[in-house]
């Protein structure tokens, strides 16, 4: 079974645990997901079964949009509503000040991922080390904030919708936002509502070619594609170097053109 869709991961489960439930549901062990969500977060997770599980690197998965609730005045080791160490009753902020900081935090932002994150350290998730009291050596990263807006502010809770690049951590954004206010803050909720063009729609199977980040190419002799025969650049409509997909009625293949040579990256993937 080839299938790709946007699933909705519930809060409290790791992405791997959630995938295991989907494997049982669809009775298919050959599956994968893209865009790990921390256990604390919920929302859109791209899931694929069968041959489609090999397509993640070709998908357009950015930008990503989240809804988040910032809890102002709270210090948490994990920057969420777990591991809370201190709660302060702070004065309510002028909405104009909050909007000003949000406007300042657009574009490229440097940050360090939170200790309680899904980042891997020598094969182990950082949050698994953090639970044991082991501090991971996480390298500084960059994220791009494309857009951010305030949805509501009911002190001490600030609800925002934020659109960011791949690899961004909203908890780190929350931490940086709080520093500019001169306070502590943590997330009380986080939901991913969109990943590229992927949105949750009851696990409806999608036409993967509409979500793939590749240009189409064309060949007159489609039998070559069906048989996995060697293809020469001269037989293709487009000759520029790069990755392309070529489709037949029932299948599609992904090829790479480099130094006047055509190489199959994936061949004869059945359409669903």
Swiss-Prot record:
Catalytic activity reported: uridine(55) in tRNA = pseudouridine(55) in tRNA
Enzyme Commission designation: 5.4.99.25
A Pfam family per the record: TruB_N
Record keywords: Isomerase, tRNA processing
Active-site residue list: 38 (nucleophile)
GO BP: mRNA pseudouridine synthesis; tRNA pseudouridine synthesis
InterPro entries according to UniProt: PsdUridine_synth_cat_dom_sf, PsdUridine_synth_N, tRNA_psdUridine_synth_TruB
GO terms of molecular function: RNA binding; tRNA pseudouridine(55) synthase activity
Function (record text): Responsible for synthesis of pseudouridine from uracil-55 in the psi GC loop of transfer RNAs.
Family membership noted in the UniProt record: Belongs to the pseudouridine synthase TruB family. Type 1 subfamily.
HAMAP family (alphabetical): TruB_bact
Name used for this protein in its record: tRNA pseudouridine synthase B
Native source organism of the sequence: Campylobacter jejuni subsp. doylei (strain ATCC BAA-1458 / RM4099 / 269.97)
Phylogenetic lineage: Bacteria, Pseudomonadati, Campylobacterota, Epsilonproteobacteria, Campylobacterales
